A protein has these predicted regions:
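A conserved beta-strand element that flanks and buttresses the S-adenosyl-L-methionine
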Residues: 84
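Class I (Rossmann-like) S-adenosyl-L-methionine-dependent methyltransferase catalytic domain
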Residues: 1-74, 113-173
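A short glycine-rich, Lys/Arg-flanked "PGG" loop and its adjoining helix->strand segment in the class I
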Residues: 98-110
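Short catalytic micro-motifs in class I SAM-dependent methyltransferases
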Residues: 87-91
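Short N-terminal helix/helix-N-cap motif within the alpha/beta-hydrolase-1
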Residues: 93-95
Length: 173
């Protein structure tokens, strides 16, 4: 699926349900301080908007996003304390994932965190068109490798509900 097809799928066939996740759902709000700026990458219908004080949501498929763009298209001088990548950097090849992570990392402050929900390649959405999506097969090892590659430490890594991987990456100066 190309980006246009992914946008169509996520805007019209997939439904967000943060309540089904323990670590990488609504509980993430408790990890954010009032003065921190959060970039929600692939925010979908921007469900954290209004619940996190300083939040910018980007998503190429949803009008509810603050910016309707991909992570590669998003440009700003602002640097963020935290990024949410909750099911958004899950599509395409190893090289595409690396490129997208690089875009996220370049938008972060030196002392930053990234919270992840990663799909280990499961085509288990409730819509038949899901079978056509090129899911990247995330593993715990990918999180360890990529976090180190980008100067982060993977400080939390575990299975969350619905067969998804929860990870927290931290970078300190």
């Amino acid at each position: 699926m190309n980006q246009e097809q992914l946008n169509e799928y996520f805007a019209h066939k997939w439904k967000s349900n943060l309540s089904q996740y323990f670590y990488c759902g609504w509980n993430l709000i408790d990890n954010i301080c009032d003065d921190e700026w959060v970039l929600d990458v692939g925010c979908g219908p921007n469900l954290f908007k209004g619940k996190i004080k300083n939040l910018i949501g980007i998503d190429p498929a949803y009008d509810e996003a603050d910016y309707k763009v991909t992570i590669e298209e998003f440009k700003t001088e602002q640097k963020f304390d935290v990024a949410f990548c909750l099911g958004s950097l899950n599509f395409g090849s190893h090289d595409k994932i690396i490129s997208e992570i690089s875009c996220v990392v370049n938008l972060l402050k030196p002392d930053a965190r990234i919270y992840w929900r990663s799909n280990p390649g499961r085509k288990d959405h409730r819509h038949k068109d899901c079978k056509q999506i090129d899911f990247f097969p995330w593993t715990f090892e990918h999180h360890k490798e990529f976090s180190k590659q980008f100067g982060f430490e993977c400080v939390d890594l575990r299975w969350d509900s619905n067969h998804r991987i929860y990870a927290e990456w931290c970078r300190t100066t």
